[in-house]
Amino acid sequence: MQKLLREFNYQDIEGIVLDLRNNGGGYLHEADSLTRLFINYGPTVQVKNPSKEVEILHSWRSTKVWEKPLIVLVNKYSASASEIFAGAMQDYNRGIIIGQTTFGKGSVQRFKSTNNGQIKFTDSLYYRITGLPTQLAGVKPNLVIPSLLNDEILGEGEYENAIKPSNIDDAYFVSFTNFDSELLQNSFQERISASDYFNKINEIKKQRESNLLLSLNIDERKLIKESDQNNTLELVNFGRTLSGKKEFVNFSEYEDYVIEDEFIMDAEIDQSLKVLVELIELES
């Protein structure tokens, strides 16, 4: 990542969108290292162990590589280390978080070796530098994008045995003050409201909310399945149109499509890029 950002600087790239959607996370210290590429110095995350001692991951030596505008795109499946990074960027006011509230996994796991293998267990919770927990709460975006993902059945909070966090003291840090995401809110909402794609999202959500009962009539089930397939096809083709690619003629063609190693634009990235352009103009 550091090498890539240096290349972007060399190419005079004016801003980036970091897509962390569906990113389930990774190592705590990798999230810490990634955060340091975007800030001067200071704390990145706090870890509270079973003895209630708090360790602050902190460095006074700057390893910052990227100083230009940053957008972080997240969704309900962004979890753990992804949330550490997104939360730090938000707390430092270093980047704008766009998407949906993240998963809410703020626990730290470790492995203990045994004679027959390893045991994975949870022994700590990590907290944002503000002292607020990510556990259960997740990271709430600055700009919310409508989604078909159901917040009520997704996330750490839906587990019966999920650990209940408490707040801790904040760590000393100095936030960036070079922009206010509220300045982008009105134009962002206007674009979302005018978008055929997101209007379709809202239409599908309303359909689902009004059809909470599942019919046992086979003909009705076939109609529901056909409607779901048509909705999916319409949303998929929207992304292909944005990418300048040929639309799928029918759902069967979409099902038979072999995913290639290529970038496909989608509506959320499209909106994020529009926000990035505005942010660049505000900071220029």
Where are these regions (language model features)?
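Polar, glycine-rich mid-to-C-terminal structural blocks
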Residues: 81, 93, 104-152
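Residues in well-ordered beta-strands of folded domains
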Residues: 45-46, 122-124, 164
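Short flexible/disordered coil segments
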Residues: 76-88, 111-114, 133-137, 158-170
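Cleft-lining beta-strand/loop regions that shape enzyme active-site pockets
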Residues: 1-115, 261, 265, 269, ...
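Conserved functional hotspot residues or short segments at active or partner-binding sites
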Residues: 134-284
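Short, functionally important structural connectors and interaction interfaces within domains
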Residues: 19, 36, 118-119, 135, ...
